[in-house]
Amino acid sequence: MIKSALLVLEDGTQFHGRAIGATGSAVGEVVFNTSMTGYQEILTDPSYSRQIVTLTYPHIGNVGTNDADEESSQVHAQGLVIRDLPLIASNFRNTEDLSSYLKRHNIVAIADIDTRKLTRLLREKGAQNGCIIAGDNPDAALALEKARAFPGLNGMDLAKEVTTAEPYSWTQGSWTLTGGLPEAKKEDELPYHVVAYDFGAKRNILRMLVDRGCRLTIVPAQTSAEDVLKMNPDGIFLSNGPGDPAPCDYAITAIQKFLETDIPVFGICLGHQLLALASGAKTVKMKFGHHGGNHPVKDVEKNVVMITAQNHGFAVDEATLPANLRVTHKSLFDGTLQGIHRTDKPAFSFQGHPEASPGPHDAAPLFDHFIALIEQYRKTAK
């Protein structure tokens, strides 16, 4: 039986469609993502916590879902908005169709709406709070009330909500077409000990670090610098994550203490913003953020352009950078800051997602730079 669904934005705009997920309601910030593939990775990316994701590509669900493509242990997106759900999921790796997957994870989703109109609206007016109601006779007045009651992501610390409860180790490398997901590597195969802060870490980021010889100890977001330094790491990684970086004072304080040492530090996405804040810069909320797999970014030092995956609603304000932070990357879409490097410490960060899950691998050499800094640190400091 086909059930109705309704998406209402805080400005009162309504989109009527059909429910393809769980019955109920979902409230969050409505954003759009321009990736053509990777919907399962997007849904399970912790960076989408408290957000309703609109996918601009018209056909979503073609290849079904599977366990190997999940970026975390659960779906973090608050809700999903798509144009069309194919009748058949066809792929040799498919184990469950998208609609069943959404229902199993209790995710409210809507299909058969004009996603182009919605995307234009979000682009022109900026990201808006919204509410999806799925079920019999969805109440538009109730949906509008819920949308307007949502406080928004400004000032919202979500990293401590999505982080791991306990530290754990990670030694599994990347998926391959012929072998699938590999077995965990032995410790003697991984010469570098890296402590990774989990602010909402994606599995593929961890796998790409393991591919380069890193034995990872994943720690909760609120782990103190003292506890991490006792682990005697070769490097410290600051993961991606959701929400506003400014309220994460616990992380900023820890990073400032790391910067008093010579241990290499590498940040991605939220980790990039936190490194900037710890260095004295400021962050700003973007109009509608960057969400997609085709964003051109210029490496200003090498004068080359890379196509990157992006997923962030906040950015580092370049005008606030202190003298000891140099700009390494800038967005060619809007000129926003994409990369920084400390001039006095082996610490750097990148706003996009170089692990590219989903997306291109142009920025993957950033991981190699991290390893080079680790090797230099081991030679001089250990």
From Swiss-Prot:
PROSITE patterns named in the record: GATASE_TYPE_1
CDD domains: GATase1_CPSase
Keyword Nucleotide-binding: yes
An MF annotation (GO) of this entry: carbamoyl-phosphate synthase (glutamine-hydrolyzing) activity
Enzyme class: ligase
Pathway in which the depicted protein is active: Amino-acid biosynthesis; L-arginine biosynthesis; carbamoyl phosphate from bicarbonate: step 1/1; Pyrimidine metabolism; UMP biosynthesis via de novo pathway; (S)-dihydroorotate from bicarbonate: step 1/3
Domain Glutamine amidotransferase type-1: start-end pairs: 193-380
EC number: 6.3.5.5
Biological processes per GO annotation: 'de novo' pyrimidine nucleobase biosynthetic process; 'de novo' UMP biosynthetic process; glutamine metabolic process; L-arginine biosynthetic process
Domain of life: Bacteria
Active-site residues, record numbering mapped to chain: C269, H353, E355
Chain spans, region CPSase: 1-189
Reaction catalysis annotation: hydrogencarbonate + L-glutamine + 2 ATP + H2O = carbamoyl phosphate + L-glutamate + 2 ADP + phosphate + 2 H(+)
Binding site for L-glutamine: S47, G241, G243, L270, Q273, N311, G313, F314
Keywords from the named record: Amino-acid biosynthesis, Arginine biosynthesis, ATP-binding, Glutamine amidotransferase, Ligase, Nucleotide-binding, Pyrimidine biosynthesis
Job of this protein: Small subunit of the glutamine-dependent carbamoyl phosphate synthetase (CPSase). CPSase catalyzes the formation of carbamoyl phosphate from the ammonia moiety of glutamine, carbonate, and phosphate donated by ATP, constituting the first step of 2 biosynthetic pathways, one leading to arginine and/or urea and the other to pyrimidine nucleotides. The small subunit (glutamine amidotransferase) binds and cleaves glutamine to supply the large subunit with the substrate ammonia.
NCBIfam families the UniProt entry points to: CPSaseIIsmall (TIGR01368), PRK12838.1 (NF009475)
Annotated family: Belongs to the CarA family.
Subunit: Composed of two chains; the small (or glutamine) chain promotes the hydrolysis of glutamine to ammonia, which is used by the large (or ammonia) chain to synthesize carbamoyl phosphate. Tetramer of heterodimers (alpha,beta)4.
This protein's name: Carbamoyl phosphate synthase small chain
Gene that encodes the chain: carA
